[in-house]
Amino acid sequence: MALLQIAEPGQSTVPHEHRLAAGIDLGTTNSLIASVQSGNASTLSDDQGRDILPSIVSYQAGNVLVGQTAQALSIEDAQNTITSAKRLIGRSLKDIQSKYPSLPYEFCGDENHPEIMTRQGAVNPVQVSAEILKSLNLRAQAALGGELTGVVITVPAHFDDAQRQSTKDAAKLAGVSVLRLLNEPTAAAVAYGLDSGQEGVIAVYDLGGGTFDISILRLNKGVFEVLATGGDSALGGDDFDVVLVDYLVEQAGLVRPLSPSLERQLMQQACFAKEQLTTKEEVDITISLDSDSDWKTSLTKAQLNKLISSLVNKTLRACRRTLKDADITIDEVIEVVMVGGSTRVPLVRSEVEKHFNKTPLTSIDPDKVVAIGAAIQADVLVGNKPDSDMLLLDVTPLSLGLETMGGLVEKVIPRNTTIPVAKAQEFTTFKDGQTAMAVHVLQGERELVEDCRSLARFELRGIPAMTAGAAHIRVTFKVDADGLLSVSAMEKSSGVESSIEVKPSFGLDDNQISQMIKDSMSNAADDMQARMLKEQQVEASRVIESVQAALLADSKLLNSDEITVIENAIKSLAQVSQGQEIKAIENALDKLNDSTAIFAERRMDSSISEALAGQAVDKI
């Protein structure tokens, strides 16, 4: 007799079977993969004992090289060797070219889907990232002796929907099953929180190769709650290298544009000097120029500090803003966790220590801590460890909402709301007989549509024809654990429904999230004034339309003088509602309401008379 194996959802049918899972830190400069074995999380090395895989892909004739082998070709074959693809993922061509003008690549494709021309043809950043994920997946299979059930991939907390979706697309292309996308700072908190049993408020300072994130978390009995996040989606150790390259170009008397190989050589020397100066006071630099001559110089730690100090200060300003968002003072922060290879720079560590007035935690390798945290979470998600041991609560970086009449934004999910989350609000129709509604989904902190970012649009059709305001349309916003948004709209009486998964065509501009938040603060008073004006204008339009419809239906209840008074009041309201004076619109609305009071009474009396006509008194 055949037997059915029964198990709880997400758990193995074999009681003590250990499922293979891994955590991947898909980094800008380097990537790692880690797994939990015998209860301990550790990074997995390749056949040469190397944990770190450089995030570099080189497209050669009939072959794709990844990691160290690709890195060796980054100078001599710069156009076919792609580095820091994470910086390009989910971005428009215009954004890439304006932010990174010295990239040695030949771009093609359309504005919203840029591609890089290589020896093997055009490739996009998603395909490049997929090659890195493939390599890490093969490493894990070799190290663990089997196929992975799934992986947790980390992303910067500031990655928007486009960048997160592109990361999932890369995993799908690589044949990797994604259990969850996890914010990098949260992954670091998982690693430190579970290992050291910390409880209280912790700041996670994450400075990687291409992104900076600061997260304020509250850890309590295994619950990780992100109170607020901030940072810069285009600031990292690569920027330290860029300012150092600019300095070397100036010192050597070079004039741009330079050859791709010379640009890459300068970048490698800058990176080498930065790394050497973490332990040395001075380093020698040699550049092989295109003229076949060498240019030599030296760089001191003091010179490096001077060059990068403005960038370090930029990260500290983001720390202050994020603490304010979390409503937390510096004194309440009990620990500061350092994440990312760029936190090895002595100036970064000393300035962070000075800012928070405490020595940062660096006991776990800052290059590995994110991958280790992701591995721990992956182990939980495949059922190797009870979910009750750990709960992760990430947050939305910007408010999500939709457009209402007058170009106003109604926020449905406020900024810094814990995810996953689902929130719904009810809306109604503006006009009599309206049978469709356009739903415009927006992201941002401002009050007007024109000042926020458009994410998606869809239509709800088939709404039963009713008088304005009678229909009840329930709009639901859902953000899943990966930070991806879906929106649905349903008319309650008929059940007609429409929905959309938000997949923007490209990501936010550099600093856009921080800039949007700053703009909302600096323009708060003006925005509220503009919102109040728009609301009064919409109300004026609604009242005028309603009164005109009533006149069309029941003008017989009024004499000519009364009609003239109402029509004059309508004209007056229509005229002032075109202006900018809120009080004038309010006064004109009051005047129209007063002039139609008798009309409203007569319409009510007429409706009652019609309803009672022909009925016996004893049945009323």
Curated annotation (Swiss-Prot):
<dbReference type="Pfam" id="PF00012">
    <property type="entry name" value="HSP70"/>
</dbReference>
<dbReference type="InterPro" id="IPR029048">
    <property type="entry name" value="HSP70_C_sf"/>
</dbReference>
<dbReference type="GO" id="GO:0016887">
    <property type="term" value="F:ATP hydrolysis activity"/>
</dbReference>
<dbReference type="InterPro" id="IPR043129">
    <property type="entry name" value="ATPase_NBD"/>
</dbReference>
<dbReference type="GO" id="GO:0005524">
    <property type="term" value="F:ATP binding"/>
</dbReference>
<protein>
    <recommendedName>
        <fullName>Chaperone protein HscA homolog</fullName>
    </recommendedName>
</protein>
<dbReference type="InterPro" id="IPR010236">
    <property type="entry name" value="ISC_FeS_clus_asmbl_HscA"/>
</dbReference>
<dbReference type="GO" id="GO:0140662">
    <property type="term" value="F:ATP-dependent protein folding chaperone"/>
</dbReference>
<dbReference type="InterPro" id="IPR018181">
    <property type="entry name" value="Heat_shock_70_CS"/>
</dbReference>
<dbReference type="InterPro" id="IPR013126">
    <property type="entry name" value="Hsp_70_fam"/>
</dbReference>
<comment type="function">
    <text>Chaperone involved in the maturation of iron-sulfur cluster-containing proteins. Has a low intrinsic ATPase activity which is markedly stimulated by HscB.</text>
</comment>
<dbReference type="GO" id="GO:0016226">
    <property type="term" value="P:iron-sulfur cluster assembly"/>
</dbReference>
<keyword id="KW-0547">Nucleotide-binding</keyword>
<dbReference type="InterPro" id="IPR029047">
    <property type="entry name" value="HSP70_peptide-bd_sf"/>
</dbReference>
<comment type="similarity">
    <text>Belongs to the heat shock protein 70 family.</text>
</comment>
<keyword id="KW-0143">Chaperone</keyword>
<dbReference type="GO" id="GO:0051082">
    <property type="term" value="F:unfolded protein binding"/>
</dbReference>
<keyword id="KW-0067">ATP-binding</keyword>
